[in-house]
Amino acid sequence: MFDTHTVEIEWAGRPLKLETGKIARQADGAVLATYGETVVLATVVSAKAPKPGQDFFPLTVNYQEKTYAAGKIPGGYFKREGRPSENETLVSRLIDRPIRPLFPEGYKNDTQVVVTVVQHDLENNPDILSMIASSAALTLSGVPFMGPVGGARVGYINGEYVLNPHLDEMDESSLDLVVAGTYDAVLMVESEAKELPEDVMLGAVMFGHKGFQPVLDAIIKLAEVAAKEPRDFQPEDYSELEGEMLKHFEAELREAYKITQKADRYAAVDAVKAKVKAHFLPEEGEAKYTAEEVGAIFKHLQAKIVRWNILDTKSRIDGRDLETVRPIVSEVGLLPRTHGSALFTRGETQAIVVATLGTGEDEQYVDSLTGMYKERFLLHYNFPPFSVGETGRMGSPGRREIGHGKLAWRAIRPMLPSAEQFPYTLRVVSEITESNGSSSMATVCGTSLALMDAGVPLAKPVAGIAMGLILEGDRFAVLSDILGDEDHLGDMDFKVAGTADGITSLQMDIKIAGITEEIMKVALGQAKGGRAHILGEMAKAITESRGQLGEFAPRIEVMNIPVDKIREVIGSGGKVIREIVEKTGAKINIEDDGTVKIASSSGKEIEAARKWIHSIVAEPEIGQIYEGTVVKTADFGAFVNFFGARDGLVHISQLASERVAKTTDVVKEGDKVWVKLLGFDERGKVRLSMKVVDQATGQEIPNEKKKEEAAE
C-alpha cells in the first residue's frame, strides 16, 4: 500500500532519518524526519497556477507544536492547541527565511509549508529538524525550488564549537547560533552570544555551514528515488519591456534617486512611475503589457539603478558614503513618571522606548514542550502604520513585530544582571514612531538607554547596526546603517548588535546565492566600526546605569526564610500572607526555596512587611523576657501571644509567686503581660512564666529566678 523511501545518516552523534511515501501522501511533498527521538512532519502544497492579478509570491510557513509530542495535555478551558505561541511564530520565520530566496523569480503560486512536531525527546530541539524536513519536502515536491537547504545549530562551549548541542548543553554555551544555506552559500544566520568577537562568530557560521553538508547529501539521496517530476515553470521574458523602460525613463529615474530626502524622493519616483504607466498602459487602444507586469518591471528597474549608482559612485540614495551612519540623537528621561524612558533617533528612524520594573508576580509563565518556565525579561516591539506615513491595521502583533522584538531581546539579554543581583521583572516596550530602515536596531539602542535610565545595572551599553550588500559579479559594496530602500533593493540584511567588546546578537538574511566568507568578514568588520560610533553617540545621553531607581519604580527587598517556615508565613488557605499584604500594602512573593521578595514603592511598607514575616519565622530564645498579650484563659493557665504569631502557655502555677486559685484572678483576655520563655515541653509546646518577671518593669525578679533554677 505504501511506497516508502528512507534515508538515514549519523549526524553530530545522533541518527537523522528522513522518510517519505507513507504519511500525508496527498500533499505535493511530505517528509517525516527523526533526529534522536524527536519527530516532525513537514508537508508542502503549492497551487497549480497563480491567482489572477497576483503580483507577489504568497509563501506561508506554519510551524506547530502539539503538546502530545511531549506527553502533555494543553492547559486552558478548551484543552486544545490555540493560536501560535511566540516560539512557533519565531520558528516559522526561521524556516521561511532560507527557503524564500530559492524560489525562482516570477513564481507566484500560493505555497504553504506546514511543519508539525509530533514527538519531542526533550533533548533535541525540533527547530533545526523542522528546517531540514521542510527543505526535504520542497525538494521532493516538484515545485520549482533551487534547494536543498541545510541547517544546523552551533554552540561554543569551553572555547570549542559544538554542532547541534543538546538542550541541556546550551546552558553552558556562550553562543546559540543557527545557520542555514546550500552547498555553496550561507543564506540565513540567527544568533545570541555572550560578547563574542567577530572572528569567533564568523568561525561559528562557517563551522555550521560545513556541519550540515551531510544533510544536503541525504536530501539529494532521498530525492533521487522519491522526487516528483519537476513542474514546468518558465518565467516570463520581460527583457524587451525592461529595455524600452530603460531607454525612455532611465535618466529621469536616476535623477529621482539623487534626491536625498525620503518624502521628496518618493514623490519624484512616483512621478516617474506615473509617466511609465501612461506610456505603457494607454487609456485608448490595447496595451501590450498588463498593469502588474509594468509595475513589476518598474520595481526591477528601480533596484538596478540604485545598485548601479552605489557600485559606480560609492554614494548612496541619501548622499552618504558606504560607511557613514546617519545623524543620531539620544535622549533619556523623556517620560519622567515612567520607570525609565528613551527617545532614539537615527536619521528618519525613531523609537520611543519605555522600561517598566515589576515583581515576581509580573513574570511571564511560558508553557513549552520542555516544561513550564518563567521569563523575567520581556521586550515588545510595535510598528504602527503611521511610522511610515501610511494607514493600516492596528491590533495584535504580527510575525514581523514578534521577530524584531525577539532580535532586540537577544541583543540585550546577555548584559542583564542576574535575578540575584537585581530581583525585578523587566518589561521594555519599543514604539516605532518613524521608520526608514533598521528599526529593530533602533530598538536595541533605545532599550539599552531606557534600562540605564531606569537604574537597571546593565553590564555594558548595547548598540545595533544594520548592514546591507550590493553584489554584481565580482563587484560588491557593503553598506552601513541601511535605509529601507537599500534593504528592499539590496542582496543582504545583516544586523549586528553588541557592546564595545563583542557581539551579543547577529542576524543575517541573504537574498542571493554566493555570499562568501570574505564578504561576511568585511561586513562584520565594518559593523564593528559602526557599532562603536553609535555607542559613542548614545554616551552623550547616558554612559552607565543610574545609581538609583526612578521615583515611581517599586523597591524590592529580598530575605530568606527556612523552607519549613513557608507554610507558617502563608497560613491556612493563604490567610496570613493575605493579612500581611492587606495591612502593610506591600507585594510579597515567596519562592519554593524560601526566597521572599517584598515589593512596594514605599520603604515603610517594605519594612513593616519584613518585620512581620521575621516575627513569624524567627525562633524565640529560651531565657529571654518578652512582652505579650493574653489571648485566652483556661482553668489550667493562660495562653499568651508573645512572639509574632507565636502563642505559649503560662501554667496556673507560673502566673504568680503566691498560690492562684483561678486564672482570671490574675489575668484576663487582652491584658498586656511580661513573660519569660522557660523552654519547650516534650511535644514542643512553649512553656512561659509570669511570676519570675516584675510585671511593672519587665525585669526579672532575682529571688524567683533562683527558685526557678533550683526547681529545674
From Swiss-Prot:
Q: Where in the cell is it found?
A: Cytoplasm
> Binding positions for Mg(2+)?
487, 493
**Keywords in alphabetical order:** Cytoplasm, Magnesium, Metal-binding, Nucleotidyltransferase, RNA-binding, Transferase
Q: Does the keyword Metal-binding apply?
A: yes
Q: Name one GO biological process term.
A: RNA processing
Q: Which residues form the KH domain?
A: 554-613
Q: Which cofactor does it need?
A: Mg(2+)
What's any one GO cellular component for it? cytosol
EC number(s) given by UniProt: 2.7.7.8
**Where in this chain does the record put each S1 motif domain?**
623-691
Its chief place of residence is cytoplasm
MF terms in GO: 3'-5'-RNA exonuclease activity; magnesium ion binding; polyribonucleotide nucleotidyltransferase activity; RNA binding
The record ties this protein, via SMART domains, to: KH, S1
One Pfam family cited in the UniProt record for this chain: RNase_PH_C
Q: Does the keyword Magnesium apply?
A: yes
**Catalytic activity, as annotated:** RNA(n+1) + phosphate = RNA(n) + a ribonucleoside 5'-diphosphate
Q: What does this protein do?
A: Involved in mRNA degradation. Catalyzes the phosphorolysis of single-stranded polyribonucleotides processively in the 3'- to 5'-direction.
Membership in a protein family: Belongs to the polyribonucleotide nucleotidyltransferase family.
Cross-referenced PANTHER family: POLYRIBONUCLEOTIDE NUCLEOTIDYLTRANSFERASE (PTHR11252), POLYRIBONUCLEOTIDE NUCLEOTIDYLTRANSFERASE 1, MITOCHONDRIAL (PTHR11252:SF0)
- Entry protein name: Polyribonucleotide nucleotidyltransferase
Q: Which organism is it from?
A: Rhizobium etli (strain ATCC 51251 / DSM 11541 / JCM 21823 / NBRC 15573 / CFN 42)
